[in-house]
Amino acid sequence: ALTALEKQSIQDIWTILKAVGLEFLQVKMFGKLFADHPEYKAHFDNFLTAIFSVAEDLVPKLRAHLHRVIDAFDLVIFALGRESLRGSLKDLGIFHTGRDIVDPVESLTGFKLMVAVIEEGLDTFRAVPEYSKGLEGRFGNVDNINENAPFR
């Protein structure tokens, strides 16, 4: 189980990543997903068509879907340590599995993807003095955070 500080650290890093921009974060997440699991592209055919053909009617749908994905990750991350949100998390899981659009293996892949993006974000921010200083103010030495990250 994660300690309270570890949970808060994950939430703080996610908040910093989101501040950079949702579209950047979404592109990172889906880019990594498709690089690691090209077989999942079939689930997103219409959205990928929108990206490559810039079909005007599909682009808003893609953007809306990507925002829903980020919102789902928000729910999971900010539910850490909050018993009151357990029901919402359960409903989110039931929604996906009930529609047969996500199986348990894919769900685990999604969480691993989220962890990888958070880790990459932390590495990126360590290289930017302003962010690194801010992280150190919150967590102490940033290098120790990365080495001892609860999500490694």
From Swiss-Prot:
Example GO molecular function term? oxygen carrier activity
Q: Which UniProt keywords apply?
A: Heme, Iron, Metal-binding, Oxygen transport, Transport
Mind telling me which residue stretches traverse the membrane in this protein?
A: none
Q: What residue stretches are annotated with the Globin domain?
A: 1-152
**Domain of life where this protein originates:** Eukaryota
Keyword Membrane annotated? no
**Annotated binding of heme b, by residue:** 96
UniProt similarity note: Belongs to the globin family.
Under the subunit heading, UniProt states:
Artemia hemoglobin is a dimer of two similar sized subunits. Each subunit represents a globin chain which exists in two forms (alpha and beta), thus making possible three different phenotypes (HB1, alpha(2), HB2, alpha/beta, HB3, beta(2)). The globin chain is a polymer of eight heme-binding covalently linked domains.
Full protein name: Extracellular globin-E7
Species classification:
Eukaryota, Metazoa, Ecdysozoa, Arthropoda, Crustacea
